């Protein structure tokens, strides 16, 4: 099993962690995140280092231990650096534009799709075919980017649709003629 839970998390300068009965609040230059963790897991802060420990070596505790450490690390990284997912659109007439905090997508449907930015998420449209989703919560950034991609996933014959930057879409061969 992975030993990720035993790794020590180092807090960068300007990041502050408060643990109140396993409800952890992490404050940093980009914002503040709060999350409740399992009562059996112990979270200690010593200077700029955070250690996560478990009471026993049962299979359940080992999994919760690793997950807790990974979530805490993502919180610390989010409030100090933030997270960003970039999407690109391929297809004739496919484009995106911002209207306030709404993302308006034209993706070959009879209507335009509008995506409201959840709290803590910002959209950036550098070119009409590239979208950047940014925020401090890795979970929320990933969910929002996945939702935008799901509005028109890449199809397997021409590759038209919304995809992550750098995502490889395997293309199928078309029908062979007579």
UniProtKB/Swiss-Prot annotation:
Q: Which family, according to the similarity comment? A: Belongs to the universal ribosomal protein uL6 family.
Full protein name? Large ribosomal subunit protein uL6
Assembly state and interactors? Part of the 50S ribosomal subunit.
What Gene3D superfamilies does this protein's entry cite? Ribosomal protein L6, alpha-beta domain
Annotated GO biological processes are:
cytoplasmic translation
Q: Does the keyword Acyltransferase apply?
A: no
**A GO term for molecular function:** structural constituent of ribosome
Which region is the signal sequence?
A: none
Gene symbol?
A: rplF
Q: Report the GO terms under cellular component.
A: cytosolic large ribosomal subunit
Q: Does the keyword Ribosomal protein apply?
A: yes
Provide this UniProt record's keywords sorted from A to Z. Ribonucleoprotein, Ribosomal protein, RNA-binding, rRNA-binding
Q: Which SUPFAM superfamilies match?
A: Ribosomal protein L6 (SSF56053)
Q: Record's superkingdom?
A: Bacteria
User: Which organism is the protein's source?
Assistant: Streptococcus uberis (strain ATCC BAA-854 / 0140J)
Report TM segments: none
Q: Which PROSITE patterns match?
A: RIBOSOMAL_L6_1
Q: What does this protein do, in the record's words?
A: This protein binds to the 23S rRNA, and is important in its secondary structure. It is located near the subunit interface in the base of the L7/L12 stalk, and near the tRNA binding site of the peptidyltransferase center.
């Amino acid at each position: 099993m992975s030993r990720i839970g035993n790794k020590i998390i180092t807090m960068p300068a300007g990041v502050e962690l408060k643990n109140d009965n396993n409800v952890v609040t992490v404050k940093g230059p980009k914002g503040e995140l709060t999350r409740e963790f399992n009562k059996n897991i112990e979270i200690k802060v010593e200077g700029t280092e955070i250690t996560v420990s478990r009471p026993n070596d049962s299979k359940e505790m080992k999994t919760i231990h690793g997950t807790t450490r990974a979530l805490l690390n993502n919180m610390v990284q989010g409030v100090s650096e933030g997270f960003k997912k970039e999407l690109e659109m391929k297809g004739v007439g496919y484009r995106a534009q911002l209207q306030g905090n709404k993302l308006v997508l034209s993706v070959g449907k009879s209507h335009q799709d509008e995506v409201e930015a959840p709290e803590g998420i910002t959209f950036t449209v550098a070119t009409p075919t590239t979208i950047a989703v940014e925020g401090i919560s890795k979970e929320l950034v990933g969910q929002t980017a996945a939702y935008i991609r799901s509005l028109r996933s890449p199809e397997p014959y021409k590759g038209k649709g919304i995809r992550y930057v750098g995502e490889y879409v395997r293309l199928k061969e078309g029908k062979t003629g007579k």
